[in-house]
């Protein structure tokens, strides 16, 4: 119980602003760890970069207009996903996607009619859940 974490209990974890700076291997290991250490019904809220509009799924593509800006700021982009593959990506790691929207959609829904500046469509927030034993991670 050190630090408040109890393995095997229903947990909610917020993993915001982290995924894009990790390697694919680190993202994979973290998701698998989360699914193995927490009880069914546990949820993971996370953000990620949607690569669908950029023409490539690797972290080395030149098509990301802000990639160099991030690198110069000491925050190199390493990982993103195409939105269409997120459900299968999570299912392979023992999780089920329950919600996935762009930050622009999330903010517009939460603050209708307000000037929100220019939130992006490619920065997304998602909710994944450890399915109950009777369910499968693919959505049963």
Predicted regions and their residues:
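Alpha-helical subdomain
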Residues: 1-140
